[in-house]
Amino acid sequence: MSAGFPLFERGAAGAEVLNAFAYTCGFSVCAAKAGARTTSLDLSKKYLEWGRRNFTLNALDPTAHDFIYGDVFDWLRRLAKKRRVFDIVVLDPPTFSQSKEHGLFRAEKDYGALVAAALPLLKAGGTLLASTNAAGLKPEEFLAAIGTAATAARRAITQRHYVPQPPDFPITRDEPAYLKTVWLKLA
């Protein structure tokens, strides 16, 4: 994922960033180091607390950023209802997860629904960082799911930067390319 992080260094100062499925808040820390104000959302209190520690370890004040515990789909709806918008939305879900509110999430079948739920929160001209390590989701299917969600939301993709699997994630015959990452600018 390191190949994607430097993109936060351009244009992140003063940006509002939503990191859904934040885990230990790696994307949030990188965005905050570049001057963004972040909102980290995750279903695990344990990992959000770890994320707060990562902010502190990186000389960032975690109290200047938001950490939201709860179901991502539920919170995407809540934030949209409150008309919250972000300059950058990061979607890097686990391949599989389960919550009481939303039930089962599988990246292979639900990535498009995730993008559809997140797009109302993305400002016009904003950037969507979409990533998955779901081996069963082919790159063309991943991009098609995102494109279908954008079209349904009447959001034109004006720029696309696909990041191939980096060298620190070796590709072998037994383990083909599974990491897919794309940066999209949407009108």
Model-inferred region functions:
Residues 1-15:
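SAM-dependent Rossmann-like transferase core, predominantly class I methyltransferases
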Residues 13-23:
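Conserved class I S-adenosyl-L-methionine
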Residues 24-36:
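Conserved SAM-binding loop of SAM-dependent methyltransferases across substrates and taxa
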Residues 37-43:
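Conserved SAM-binding motif I beta-strand of class I
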Residues 44-90:
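S-adenosyl-L-methionine
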Residues 86-117:
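Mobile active-site "lid"/loop adjacent to the S-adenosyl-L-methionine
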Residues 122-124:
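Helix-to-beta-strand junctions that scaffold the AdoMet/dcAdoMet cofactor pocket
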Residues 127-187:
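C-terminal catalytic and target-recognition region of SAM-dependent MTase-like enzymes
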